[in-house]
Amino acid sequence: MATLACRVQFLDDTDPFNSTNFPEPSRPPLFTFREDLALGTQLAGVHRLLRAPHKLDDCTLQLSHNGAYLDLEATLAEQRDELEGFQDDTGRGKKNSIILRTQLSVRVHACIEKLYNSSGRDLRRALFSLKQIFQDDKDLVHEFVIAEGLTCLIKVGAEADQNYQNYILRALGQIMLYVDGMNGVINHSETIQWLYTLVGSKFRLVVKTALKLLLVFVEYSESNAPLLIQAVSAVDTKRGVKPWSNIMEILEEKDGVDTELLVYAMTLVNKTLAGLPDQDTFYDVVDCLEELGIAAVSQRHLNKKGTDLDLLEQFNIYEVALRHEDGDETAEPPPSGHRDRRRASMCSGGTVGEQQGLDRRRSRRHSIQNIKSPLSAPTSPCSPSVPAFKPSQVRDLCEKDEEEEEEEEQPITEPNSEEEREDDAQCQGKDSKASSASGQSSPGKDAAPESSALHTTSSPTSQGRWLSASTAARSPVLGGTSGPEASRPAARLLPPSPGLATRPSTAPKVSPTIDKLPYVPHSPFHLFSYDFEDSPLLTKDKGGDSQTENRYSNFSSNSFQSSRPSPGPSGSPSYASSFSSPQDTRSSPSGLLTSSFRQHQESLAAERERRRQEREERLQRIEREERNKFNREYLDKREEQRQARGERYKYLEQLAAETQEKEPRSQSVSRGRADLSLDLSLPAAPAPPSPSSQSPSADSQEALPVPSSPPTLQCPQVSGKDHEPELEAEAGQGADEASQDIASAHRGAESQEEPVLELEPEERASLSEKERQNEEVNERDNCSASSISSSSSTLEREEKEDKLSEDRATGLWSTSLQDVGVNGQCGDILTSKRFMLDMLYAHNRKSTEDEEKDDGEPGRSAQEVEAVASLATRISTLQANSQAPEESIKRVDIGCLDNRGSVKAFAEKFNSGEVGRGAISPDVESQDKVPDTPPAQLKTESDYIWDQLMANPRELRIQDMDFTDLGEEDDIDVLDVDLGHREAPGPPPPPPPTFLGLPPPPPPPLLDSVPPPPVPGNLLASPVFNTPQGLGWSQVPRGQPAFTKKKKTIRLFWNEVRPFEWPSKNNRRCREFLWSKLEPIKVDTSRLEHLFESKSKELSVTKKTAADGKRQEIIVLDSKRSNAINIGLTVLPPPRTIKIAILNFDEYALNKEGIEKILTMIPTEEEKQKIQEAQLANPEVPLGSAEQFLLTLSSISELSARLHLWAFKMDYETTEKEVAEPLLDLKEGIDQLENNKTLGFILSTLLAIGNFLNGTNAKAFELSYLEKVPEVKDTVHKQSLLHHVCTMVVENFPDSSDLYSEIGAITRSAKVDFDQLQDNLCQMERRCKASWDHLKAIAKHEMKPVLKQRMSEFLKDCAERIIILKIVHRRIINRFHSFLLFMGHPPYAIREVNINKFCRIISEFALEYRTTRERVLQQKQKRANHRERNKTRGKMITDSGKFSGSSPAAPSQPQGLSYAEDAAEHENMKAVLKTSSPALEDATPVLGVRTRSRASRGSTSSWTMGTEESPSVTDDAADEIMDRIVKSATQVPSQRVVPRERKRSRANRKSLRRTLKSGLTPEEARALGLVGTSELQL
């Protein structure tokens, strides 16, 4: 066991601003550290030994010899590098020690807290000490920056006076001297903004210090210059002034003459400009300064005698840099502090002289200077020399050319909005002017063609041609270039064209190559237009006429640019051959200016109007193409489902044909049979999973082969007026059509691939208008496909989808969401209505007369009713038989979850003679073959209709939970299939091979085998629920009783009634329960007084009549029963109110707990009879409260049915949610585990470790072992096996996750009992079926039609949702079994796996893994941070970069006087750094504390800060370093041999001064249209 014995001390730094303390005690004691234990566990012993005043939680340990802080969570052995040199003898007999002191974060927090909360002298003392604190501890600066200390300084400084600001600036300067501090300032833009704000202060010292800090900031790194520009722009924009206004106020000497401030300000400008990498930013800054008048300030100081030499030098640097950037060849080379910005010239094929600024941005001085004197030698050969330009046009043209140059191969787009179109139009005008100027700069022989080209721009030929971006980019500079030369680059960039494009005004067509179009995912879809036939493709055989004709066809080239940002500037060497000679463009006849300008304006107006019309057509085409793309994906998906259904319905058709052959021919078919036949044919139509996937709209089907729906199920989409007659006609068809529906369904499935005819735009418009008018009616009728507008946009479809989803969330579910045809809509409406009526009135029929009475439909004959019953049973049988092939392989012993039993029930009903006149099912023959069939209860007609509803395909959605991905393949339980093969004796099959790659789960077997015959009926029978079952209500505990009085008054009733919050608040059925109509009764005080007085009067009379000692009330019930009822009445409204609430199903009067309470009080027949007899025997004696309440309840007809139905209604939403949400979680959890890569990494690592430890080669292991992994520990470090697995996974798979956050659904599933969930689902079905019986019983008595209709809709909705839940449950359980096979569980043990336990094992293991992984990553990150921290820990900015004391010598330094001066200055700087560094090195690299020196030794201690002179020495050294840095920045650097270039992103830009240097004459200003504009004033 290794140990380390050393001296320990503590430093009392509980007050971070007190920097005068020394380590204590002076004679340090020894403490022995164990190297194998974490230091945090040994810290308490050190704290107790030293009796330190610190809080134990705030302490840390620091090494005295290098000031490094030790990691308390690591051991000394792990920090061996930090202890290097710790035990070495210093040579003076003094040993190093470990210092116990306050943690950095605690000290920084205390500093910031004191700065925020102090004021007056305390704040002044704290700010004054701040610089010394940073000098004492080099680690404090880094922690201060991380803890948002800079924000604290800015906040305090913004509210303080100039003295406090000076203290803050001193501290900030100390921070910036450290590399860590400088990096913090770089990342904190608010600090730079605040420093620039202080430049505008009225106090000289504040301004001077702020300028010095900004100079140090800019000088530190060239990348800091753009940061300063951003800060300046942000501050001045917020103030509403132009950028750099504070600097210009100093240069204009508004507050008096201060040469030092002038030098600092101008140096800051030059250093900022020198660090800019691109030309645009350079000119933006320069132009702002020029607008603020720096040219006048510069000239005043340059021409004034006696100007300070340093200031004069800075102004000269600015002027030289500006002229050099403008391309002035006479300018001197820029000093090394400046560089040439890189230019991506477009003429790379020409000579160097031609490339030097051919298409480049110039300053504002430069441009107007050339316009003023066109005969003077321009800087650039291609600089414009005709006064047809506005100064802003120069920049706009440059911007266009550069954008076209960078984005020449990007897709063509349209502007986003009308504002962009107007901007594009303005840009077009500017481009046109630029083009005319370019044309006039050519020799005289080319002037006439150029002039004539102005008239031809509006011709049909030129209108029909659209130049691509790359061609349009060259057109402004194609002065005298011949046609073939100009078309050669186009031939390289554009694909060959079969011919010229058609005019955009022709009928738009979609190219067949639309699938190959580029798509930019980050751009809005409506920005893309792919008009292949509208895009012109230039050919080589077009001569000069073609170029002249298309000269001005590039007006909209800017609108063609993609909105996607450019990846960067790119040179285009292919442009070289397309430019004319520079010498040819220097002179131009100025007489064509007026006529050319006017003609161009006229042609531009016509061109703009034409282009606006073309944009509208293009936008329409864009929308159509995007919808085509949307519908194409939808159609591909639907086609696969149609093909799958087609196979299924082929088998259905065969069954139908056999049934019709065996069916008695004399059977007459009623209208109801036709309705059900229509409903039977519905499944042949595609069933869209959501309203968004509807039948494709007519105009979105252009040029696309769209499969149509069956003609018998969907009629063509015509105007909305034709829908209703078709509905009636289809509904009224007779027996002939009904007998053909089954065959037509198959024929319709075969005809699905016929293309749908396109509709003309006029028809689409009328259809869209009519459909919008009928939108509400269509949604109310639940017509999903043909009711959607065929020309609606994508946004409209999404809005309709949202609306339909809201309706679905409120419980208005409908099976007609699966239908797409008019016939289907009609059949669905009739079927839904008939379903509710049959569920209300259906029962075991005995005679025709009873049927007519019970149904309440005197108009229906006995033959019609019997036909409907026969056809209903036949449909149920056919649908069950159609699913028998796949059902036969997925039947499991689920009990009540088996929702198909129509075949057996129908056969039993037939054998009992009940279906004497009905159809004979072919399954009756197979019934005879099954011996010993156990007798079963007969199903009622409602059960058949329930089965029919279950057999219809529907959308698997429960509220907002989507189960649509549970397909029919999930109906197959792989366990049943495997059990069939496992009957033979033998060992169980091996598990899946490995988890390394996490392969997908195995496909369900026997998919390609022949479907087996239908299973005998006794195996398909489902439980019969024909009597109400006990609901087993549990007593839900309440809070404090709402009523404290014994008297039952109306006032107590009003206090009880309050809105009952149940899950479905948005349910449409709840809107009728508004208690506002009862408010007049509540506020009618006179009636309240009257009612109260009458009761009091009666009570007094009753007491008087009891004078003879007889009983005052009739008591019939026993005391226990009576007391229970009286106690229950204390929390219920008055009995009369209860009766009204029960009759009206008023949930505002009675909540769920009240209904449950009343259910326990329902009077029995015996109690009712006794109460009535006692009341008849003593009519004058009042009943007791309990007896009166029971008598009131007994007066309510069908009380038990009402209460149970009401309880089911109020409890359904919660129960459904409790069933559906766990199922959804389990489904998502299976997907999460299947697709989780981290789980695969963990299992593979664990498998490899186990194989090694066991000496085996196992392929897999049961996942139940995962719960034991954290318990296994190694024998050396006692760390768990999970820790080692986690470490290996993190090292080998850095992109792995923590697993726990990715399997949230599994964690939620671990808390669910799925056995109880299955029981709840069965109980939901039982209660729903019993509720139909309850509603039927209630409907026999007096019941409001609206209430009956609403309850019927609710129960129908619940039935559909329960059926969906059963299907979802079965499929999810089957999927879970497949998943267990996929995870390696042996098949024979899968049935015994408990879902809850399995999920809990995975979840708990994932939680343990996440905790362990965080600890491993934390340790790893600490080590990485420590290594990174040591790179800059305590490092000064003078040790690196420009400020380093030693810099490599340049290979070829110019010799001379300037070089000698620079060398002398360099040596001086090195001397300053060497003399100042020892003081700082003694203060900063070593522990920043003060120690006592031993006078007897006569030698200086290493703790040099113990002397009284050290603070001033340190401050002077730090200030001297800062001054030297600023001084070196203000002095002129040596010239650079190779100037650096700035990146140019826009062409032909010059500085503002060059553009406006000499001004304009009034005639030139009027010719350019500049009169009254800001350009003339500039």
Swiss-Prot record:
Stretches assigned to the GBD/FH3 domain: 18-405
Coiled coil: 597-645
UniProt-annotated location(s): Cytoplasm, Cytoskeleton; Cytoplasm, Myofibril, Sarcomere, Z line
Biased composition (Low complexity): 434-446, 553-583, 675-684, 692-701, 784-793, 1444-1456
Lineage: Eukaryota, Metazoa, Chordata, Craniata, Vertebrata
Top-rank taxon, per record: Eukaryota
Domain FH1 positions: 985-1016
Keyword Transport belongs to the record: no
Region annotated Disordered, chain positions: 324-518, 535-824, 915-942, 979-1013, 1418-1462, 1490-1514, 1528-1565
Native source organism of the sequence: Mus musculus (Mouse)
Biased composition (Acidic residues): 399-425, 751-761
The protein's name in its UniProt record: FH1/FH2 domain-containing protein 3
Record-stated family: Belongs to the formin homology family.
Keywords per UniProt: Actin-binding, Coiled coil, Cytoplasm, Cytoskeleton, Phosphoprotein
Record's subunit section: Interacts with nestin/NES-based interfilament (IF). Interacts with SQSTM1.
Residues modified to Phosphothreonine: T413, T933
GO molecular function, one term: actin binding
Comp. bias intervals (Basic and acidic residues): 599-651, 762-782, 795-809
Alphabetical GO biological process terms: actin filament network formation; cardiac myofibril assembly; negative regulation of actin filament polymerization; sarcomere organization
Free-text function comment from the UniProt entry: May play a role in actin filament polymerization in cardiomyocytes. Actin-organizing protein that may cause stress fiber formation together with cell elongation.
Record-listed Phosphoserine modification sites: S345, S376, S921
Biased composition (Polar residues): 368-383, 453-473, 584-598
Start-end of Pro residues biased regions: 985-1013
Biased composition annotated in UniProt, kind: Basic residues: 1420-1434, 1541-1556
Name of the encoding gene: Fhod3
Domain annotation DAD: ranges: 1515-1547
